Amino acid sequence: PSADAQGRGIVVAGDTASPAVGTLARALAEHLDWPLLAEPTSQARGGPQALTRYAELLATGPGRDLVAQADHLIVVGHPSLSRSVTALLGREDLDITVLTERAGWTDVPGRARRVIPVDGLGARMTDDAASRATRLADSLTLVRADAAWAEAWRRAVADLPEPERPGSTDAVANAAVEVVWEAARPVGAPILLVGSSMTVRRLDRLA
């Protein structure tokens, strides 16, 4: 990372059964103005910081250039859907913090600088996610990024070539995934159960 990258970081949110954990990941990304790479089952995939097609972006030259400008990485939940995210978690040039609500956490390469139990953050039941995110960021001396940081990630995603849709059957399947995802997003909507690894990867790519 460059010398001026102190306030630049990335939040990765993987699978979790806890809505509070997903909400905290999203709140951290919004508080710090960092890009949010959130898997569909992270319960964090929403808001202005969440990026679509992030796994594709990380595998491109512009994506690698953006990662090289980052200084911090926060990992929440259990990310496991893409090789490009796994490679990101294994980088030696990032200060990596893992937030975990379970006994086992994702740090396969052993690169995490610190592991913090989410339930050990000293939060009161009356706290909202924004308050918890603020206290956590302060405790880790994390600095809010300049607005250009997140915007650079959004532009890079927007500049990705349109995904190939090789046949009508594939196009129909993609459209169906998008419709189901949108129907499951509102508060109070029925729980969406995704039944196979290929299905959730398609959802991760399209939704």
Put a short name on every predicted segment.
Residues Q6, L32, E92, A184-G188:
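A structural signal for short coil/turn segments at secondary-structure junctions
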Residues A17-A25, G63, H78-S82, L142, ...:
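Generic structural signal for well-ordered, non-membrane alpha-helical segments
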Residues P1-A5:
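Conformationally flexible catalytic loops at phosphate/diphosphate-handling active centers
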Residues R8-I10, H72, I191:
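Structural motif
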Residues G63-R83, A129-E164:
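Extended, charge-rich low-complexity interaction segments
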Residues A13-P109, L206-A207:
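Glycine-rich, anion-gripping cofactor-binding loops and their flanking helix/strand elements
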Residues A152-A207:
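Active-site diphosphate/adenylate-binding microenvironment
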Residues I96-A147:
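Terminal amphipathic helices with adjacent charged low-complexity linkers/tails
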